[in-house]
């Protein structure tokens, strides 16, 4: 247990669980890591980490390659599938994402938000989709909302207090490749998103990649998630980028809103 948390009136925390989560996060972030690398990165002794790894291996949470590198184990596959499949947004939204990918011929995403980051629940590839490491990173690594069109569309419609809290946590110019230079510049973008109903990412994160995102909203200020379309700049330009695709993205988001409301 964490005695300091108890003394401060906070819920008690089991330190061993927190340590295990740190180890799992490190393996995920590095896409494989050695015992020595874990010892360098974490504030734990080599012997302690070795004990954790032996336990995690025993239950299938981690696996060890022949060269000694630890990877996440197959234990996560059914667990993550269950977590995703049990959400109403995934169950009621994926059909519309498939339709959107067919209509636009590009890659469509269904995302939700957790702790100020976007999580990809579902991805559908259109006939002109280009599979890239970018899409893989989107699925595997939750990113701060301001770094993508889908994320900005969520951020724009969050309650003002929470939106301002998330903006205050951004280290502008250091933690992402987006060219948004200041909190005020981001606020101006988000005001435009609220006015037009959708957000764009015009090569802000990846050179040559454009995307359009629209929020999935409820009756109140709640934002369930967002819909987005992503494509190479040469395949998403002019009339498509200015009106046709945004209209389809907003339509898909609205249909999912209706399905969530009437489920």
From Swiss-Prot:
It comes from the Archaea. Residues 89-262 form the IclR-ED domain. One of its GO terms (molecular function) is DNA-binding transcription factor activity. SUPFAM superfamilies: GAF domain-like, Winged helix' DNA-binding domain. Transmembrane segments: none annotated. Keywords: Arginine metabolism, DNA-binding, Plasmid, Transcription, Transcription regulation. One of its GO terms (biological process) is negative regulation of DNA-templated transcription. InterPro entries: GAF-like_dom_sf, HTH_MetabolicPath_Reg, Tscrpt_reg_IclR_C, Tscrpt_reg_IclR_N, WH-like_DNA-bd_sf, WH_DNA-bd_sf. Residues 14-74 form the HTH iclR-type domain. Induction: No induction in fermentatively grown cells. The keyword Transcription regulation applies. Pfam families: HTH_IclR (PF09339), IclR_C (PF01614). Residues 35-54 bind DNA. Probably regulates transcription of the arcABC operon. This is Probable HTH-type transcriptional regulator ArcR. It comes from Halobacterium salinarum (strain ATCC 29341 / DSM 671 / R1). The gene is arcR.
């Amino acid at each position: 247990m964490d005695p300091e948390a108890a003394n401060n009136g906070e819920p008690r925390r089991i330190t061993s669980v927190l340590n295990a989560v740190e180890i799992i996060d490190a393996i995920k972030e590095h896409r494989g890591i050695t015992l020595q690398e874990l010892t360098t990165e974490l504030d734990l002794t080599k012997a302690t980490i070795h004990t954790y790894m032996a336990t995690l291996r025993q239950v299938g949470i981690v696996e060890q390659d022949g060269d000694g590198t630890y990877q996440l184990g197959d234990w996560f596959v059914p667990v993550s599938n269950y977590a995703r499949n049990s959400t109403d947004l995934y169950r009621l939204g994926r059909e519309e994402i498939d339709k959107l990918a067919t209509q636009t011929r590009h890659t469509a995403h269904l995302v939700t938000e957790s702790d100020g980051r976007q999580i990809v629940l579902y991805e559908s590839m259109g006939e002109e989709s280009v599979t890239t490491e970018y899409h893989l990173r989107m699925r595997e690594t939750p990113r701060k909302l301001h770094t993508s069109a889908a994320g900005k569309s969520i951020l724009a419609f969050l309650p003002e207090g929470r939106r301002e809290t998330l903006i205050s946590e951004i280290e502008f110019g250091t933690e992402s490749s987006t060219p948004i230079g200041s909190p005020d510049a981001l606020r101006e973008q988000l005001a435009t998103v609220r006015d037009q109903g959708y957000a764009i990412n015009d090569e802000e994160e990846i050179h040559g990649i454009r995307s359009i995102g629209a929020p999935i909203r409820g009756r109140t200020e709640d934002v369930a998630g967002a819909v987005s379309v992503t494509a190479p700049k040469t395949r998403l330009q002019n009339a498509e980028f200015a009106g046709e695709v945004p209209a389809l993205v907003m339509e898909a988001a609205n249909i999912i809103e209706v399905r969530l409301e009437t489920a």
